[in-house]
Amino acid sequence: VNIQILVYHQPYIPVHRNIIPGVLNMKVPRCMSTQHPDNVNPPFFAEEPELGGEDEIREAYYVFSHLGCDEQMWDCEGKEVDNYVVKKLLTKYQAFFQDHVLGEDLRLTLRVPNPTVERAEAKILLETLESIPRSYDTASLFYGMDAAPVFEVILPMTSSSSCLNRIHSYYLDFVKGKERLQLADGVTVKEWIGEFRPDEINVIPLFEDHEGMLNAAKITGEYLDGKDLMEQRVFLARSDPAMNYGMISATLLNRIALSDFRDLEEESGVKLYPIIGMGSAPFRGNLRPDNVEDVTGEYRGAYTFTVQSSFKYDHEPSEVIRGIKKLRSVKPGRAPEIERESVLEIISAYCREYRRQVMDLVDIINRVARYVPGRRKRKLHIGLFGYSRSMGNVSLPRAITFTAALYSLGVPPELLGFNALSSGDLEFIEEVYPGLRRDLHDAARYANPESPFLSPEVKSTLEEYIEPEYDEGHMKTTEEIIRALRINRTANLQELILEAASQRKFLG
């Protein structure tokens, strides 16, 4: 595509504005659309049930223009990385993006591989960073002024400030910095090619494991040290910690990190904007269009919430639009104080029992996981193999598939490990996590009390704590799934898994 057609016959006159992240007080998004494949129903614009690269271009436009999200996370890990997403969006949807400036009114935020963990995809990080100035040039031609459509990247599995500083420094020294290099004839790269902008990018740490969550504020503080930043975004996972440590542990770890971020903000004077990665299953966050106020009230201190594929595509569009509007308008709360040591003691006991029960089910989980349908053509990030150290060399599916497999067996993963908690523990947890009863009730609805995979101790403890209202339709479908597995007739197993997921309105 000849990029000149994007200018609308408007001459490009550079308007040099201060676009260094953290210096300009830009509008921080409240609602981040992501590419997590937890949906049952494919979106209407998809050519196939599994979304491919061009579908994701259409998706970004759809969530901006129709659903009302103010940010799209773009995953740069996997087989079909598209470093021309900005050019494609501005080319295909010119009228919309002329009225809505990408990088100011709306954000496209890239999720990059972490070379410390994902060695096989490490060089994709460099390719992605190199694409940022090209996207800047494309947008500047389109808007007729300096425009930075991408100026932040998300680093998954952040475990140290060094991981963040390496990316920040690489961009400054090798992407931006190459313009100062001199060629053999004495001409600089800048004179030959032009400027490389934006001048700087910022890195959003994504904390996904136990240690990362407990040290999130410390790591962020070290990254801020020596930088002239007025604001910083930070990202807390909710899904992978649930898979690794159980739902209650994940929620409590989020609470600790949010409380620590509040303290860091006060000490550093840098405004922090925490993002929480929420799915629709209670296990992965329980964020749906109909309970936005409950969840945002539960996660006081969080500023931005993710809406994943199930939120967007498994509900009526009018409900989704209302839910997103609420997400964007609700006033952020202040993170409360946390009794850290008491919380950590509960996490330790609960996590041990949760992992023991997962180990008992690992074979059946992996067997069912093979039949859980995919919803994206490319894989997302490699992620944490949370059981490889403490539970032997056990391989488990990713969190969405893991969740879908257990729900299909009538064993919502939210219930695992619950029997490790005393009545005193539960009273204390409810002070920190007031929505515990609600989340368990939402999950237990899809349990099958007759499932051979639901342990009697979990069932009895649960029924003492809440009064489950089992969904008869879902119970019947899980009975068919269990019967098919028992007699090894799996021809229609995927169809049954989708039927159960449709009844829940989320895949996993």
Indicate where each model-derived feature is located.
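Structured, charged N-terminal subsegments at the starts of enzyme catalytic cores
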Residues: 73-155, 159-163, 170
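N-terminal amphipathic/basic-hydrophobic helices that include classical n-h-c signal peptides
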Residues: 1-25
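Core alpha/beta catalytic barrel or barrel-like domain that forms the active/cofactor pocket
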Residues: 105-114, 142-160, 182-208, 228-247, ...
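A cross-taxonomic marker for long C-terminal extensions/tails that follow the last structured domain
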Residues: 210-213, 221-294, 309-360
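Acidic, glycine-enriched catalytic cores built around paired aspartates
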Residues: 22-76, 84-94, 104, 303-305, ...
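Well-ordered, non-membrane alpha-helical segments in soluble/globular domains
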Residues: 82-94, 124-138, 164-178, 216-222, ...
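Structural alpha-beta junctions
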Residues: 134-147, 174-180, 229, 259-273, ...
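Short boundary motifs at domain starts and secondary-structure transition points
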Residues: 6, 19-22, 97-102, 143, ...
